[in-house]
A protein has these predicted regions:
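Intrinsically disordered, low-complexity Ser/Thr/Pro/Gly-rich regulatory segments
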Residues: 1-71, 76-196
């Protein structure tokens, strides 16, 4: 019988191993390049698991009324809809082509989590429809207590489900399931947290 949990953990371990390789070479002097490398690692991992007609880029999305998102680390789009601009992996995509967006962080702390969720929510509003809108952080720092963080709960409520997936390090995953049918103003989020 297949062991899907072990399979997913092996992918997680691969990402962890790859993320440290460049840091071990460059040391602490070039964290910006280290962050870009981590985006590349995640892009390649995603591309290896997506169908051939689904592409990955970085750049901007044009929404209704020619509104433009802030810069997006990873844009997942279909090649069946023409892009507005492309140079290498840099794209400007119409909202109709976009299937998902991901903000990539080396490390999230309670201090920058709210800003990151707000940034991703704003980009989701410009896209104007439900898409995969995720935040992927290789690590998360002190102050983020997943199950009891009032700050996290408050920020997620304000995002109104626009951010629907958050990965914090190798051990924590948060998913938005929609709205509570008995309380339409209440978002339903759940966490999978394997941290001991």
């Amino acid at each position: 019988m297949p062991d899907y949990v072990a399979y997913r953990k092996s992918i997680s371990n691969e990402l962890i191993d790859l993320k440290d390789r460049v840091r071990n070479f460059i040391g602490r002097g070039h964290w910006g390049e280290d962050g870009r490398y981590k985006e590349i690692i995640l892009k390649e991992c995603l591309q290896n698991h997506l169908p051939a007609n689904i592409k990955i880029g970085t750049g901007f999305i044009m929404g209704e009324g020619n509104r433009i998102t802030k810069q997006i680390d990873i844009i997942i789009y279909t090649d069946s809809c023409p892009l507005l601009f492309q140079k290498g992996e840099f794209i400007i995509a119409p909202k109709e082509a976009v299937l998902g967006i991901i903000e990539v962080k080396t490390k999230l702390t309670i201090n920058n989590l709210e800003e990151t969720i707000a940034h991703s929510s704003e980009n989701g509003q410009i896209v104007g429809r439900t898409i995969f809108n995720g935040i992927f952080s290789y690590e998360y720092g002190m102050g983020i207590h997943i199950e009891r963080s009032e700050v996290l709960k408050s920020v997620l409520r304000r995002s109104s489900g626009l951010v629907n997936y958050i990965c914090l390090g190798p051990d924590c995953f948060i998913k938005h399931w929609g709205y509570d049918t008995d309380h339409p103003n209440r978002n339903q989020y759940s966490t999978i947290n394997e941290q001991i």
